[in-house]
Amino acid sequence: MTTLLVLTNLPDRANADRLADSLVERRLAACVNILAPCRSAYRWKGAVQHDEEHPMLIKTTAERYSALEAAIRAMHPY
């Protein structure tokens, strides 16, 4: 069994909690760590933007990665 650590960022704690609960409940993740908010810089519509995000570390297996990715894409707000 190959273990993976997946990183994603959510815009707020409520979305992070909702996604974490869903992934663990559906057994797509063994554990999810919601980290302290951080400040992200990125380019959007031709300008550099800055926003606060909540990083998430998601522990899963290679066998469950495809289903995990699909769940994140379905629930992620951006």
Describe each region flagged by the PLM:
Residues M1-Y78:
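Positively charged, small/polar-rich N-terminal and surface patches that mediate targeting and assembly
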